[in-house]
Amino acid sequence: MEASRGPPRVKNKAAAPVQISAEQLLREATDRQEEALQKPTQRFEDLEELHEYQGRKRKEFESYCQRSGFNLKNWLQYAQWELEQKEYARSRSVFERALNLHANKVTLWIRYVEAELKSRNINFARNLLDRAVTHLPRVDKLWYKYVWVEEMLGNIPGVRQVFERWMEWQPDEAAWSAFIKLEQRYGEYDRAREIFTRFTMVHPEPRNWIKWSKFEEEYGTSDRVREVFERAIEELSKYGDEFVEERLFIAYARYEAKLHDLDRARAIYKFGLENLPRSKAMLLHKEYTTFEKQYGDREGVEDVVLSKRRRHYEDLVRENPKNYDVWFDYARLEEASGDIDRTREVYEKAIAQVPPTQAKRHWRRYIYLWIFFALWEETEAKNPERARQVYDTCLKLIPHRTFTFAKVWMHKAHFEIRQGDLAAARKTLGRAIGMCPKDRLFKGYIEMEQKLYEFGRCRILYEKHIAYNPANCSTWVKWAELERGLDDLDRARAILDMGIAQPVLDMPEVVWKSYIDFEEEEGEYDKTRSLYERLLDKADHPKVWISYAQFEINIPEEAGEGADEEQEQPVSDEAKARARRVFERAHQGFKDKEMKAERVSILNAWLVFEKTHGSAEDIEKIEKQMPRRTKKKRKLDDDTWEEYVDYIFPADEQVGKNLMNMMAKARARKQAEAEAAAKAAAADDGGESGE
């Protein structure tokens, strides 16, 4: 059963030794084919037999035509047979009868005309062609036949008359081209120009105008060629930009370049690039680039590149006017070109695209357009008055009640300083702080006054800044650094003390560290210890304890009279003892609070300290206290389990073992007492039974 399924399998798939080709198969089939029967040749002995034969054939044709009159082939065979019999009248009658049924068949008209021409009935053929083009005026083949007949007869006015009749129907481009070529053959160039005029009105495609320009280039003058191109651009512009194509400008510019009128060619290229959409001017720009490389200089080539990029950016901002990144690139392009008027125009168009909402995220990129515009007016255009106007307009535009931009205020103030008007700069920043206070505005204003060495103004500004935002740690630190730089340590200490006393700070560790570093650098070690103790009361963190221990180590000892201050002094035993006491306090505190992770951090730092400053016994002592890591599981609120890392300390483990031993001894003692009591009770029961 399985062997019978499917096609038979070929066991030997190798090529046969004798190959049979398709050509061989066809040749054998042809050789074996029997010869077809040939119709015997018919001979007529006299006219009577001929007439009999003709009558019989006519009856057959008539029968065919009556049965299938809509079959044009029967009529054509009938008419052709009558022509072979030299019966022209009968043939003409057959054609006319066929036309009554098939008046729209072009083939019938052509065969009828050719039959009359073969019979040398020229006037009959002309009449037929006239009837044909009148009945089927949209069939170009009949018109071409009519024109050919008249031209073969040498009737050029008649040909021209036929063409005129034809052109009234506004045929396709090939018919107009044939009419023009007729006039060219006979040297009637003015007539050809007149035909071109009508031709371009009916078919105003650019290719037809280019044909006209080539005609004028061959038979006319350069002025006529220019007139054709200019007229083409003017006429096509009336229909809209979609009818104007880049190849028209390319042909015009190439012609001018051929005449070595490079300025005119360059102007044509630029005109085309400015008036055509970028999507339709890719080839034009490529041709312009090639032209500049061939005939222009470096400036010309750069102008081509700038023109291409300019068109690209114009298309992008036309599609999305709120794409500020494109405006940035567009403005930089114009800045690189050095055209002040064009650059200013681009910036003005860009800043006119105000964000539609008052959300600051929509304004972040937009505001840089104003800043770049003002900087360009100041540095490149050398017009400070216009730059000031740009800043003022920008500040009026920003909704300061909702948000503000400190960078704009700062740029305006720096601009006024560069112009030598310090009062205007202070007025600008004062107005900014009064209208919309902001940390960055205070910071910039203070930095400006510091550079001017106006420290009294800096103190006033710091006071206002603290009143505005007392939680800003950077303000406290910077103010203290200013006072320390002015050698007013008491004021700096008071400022830092006020800073750490604030109930809310964004980064309190910064103020504490600055205060501690300040006291340490000034050599006030007791005050530094006091600060550490105060900090530990607020934040019991391992990092604070480690920093505290490092501080105790780094306290320099009082050097003798002959000691070199620059030479590094060894750490004293007293400093090591102080540091160890700090570590012991930290370790014991975290141990009491059962804070294992913090306890491990302290032990690691303590071990590093002992490896650096301690002995082998000290290191061993700390290593014995180091815990071992173990993985445990705990149940969560959603009845799932998670794995976590726990630390087991040797001291805690020993305490646990001792506690277990004590509990075991207590259990054993209780069990012994219970057994003794049971034995005593049993003895009492036995004595009573004996009595």
Curated annotation (Swiss-Prot):
SUPFAM superfamilies listed in its UniProt record: TPR-like
Pfam families: HAT_PRP39_C, HAT_Syf1_CNRKL1_C, HAT_Syf1_CNRKL1_N
Protein name: Pre-mRNA-splicing factor CLF1
Subcellular location: Nucleus
Protein origin, superkingdom: Eukaryota
Family: Belongs to the crooked-neck family.
GO cellular component, one term: post-mRNA release spliceosomal complex
Alphabetical UniProt keywords: mRNA processing, mRNA splicing, Nucleus, Repeat, Spliceosome
GO biological process terms, semicolon-separated: spliceosomal complex assembly
Each HAT repeat, start to end: 52-84, 86-118, 120-152, 154-185, 187-218, 220-258, 260-294, 304-336, 338-372, 382-418, 420-451, 453-485, 487-521, 523-554, 574-612, 617-650
Role played: Involved in pre-mRNA splicing and cell cycle progression. Required for the spliceosome assembly and initiation of the DNA replication.
Lineage, top ranks: Eukaryota, Fungi, Dikarya, Ascomycota, Pezizomycotina
Complexes and interactors: Associated with the spliceosome.
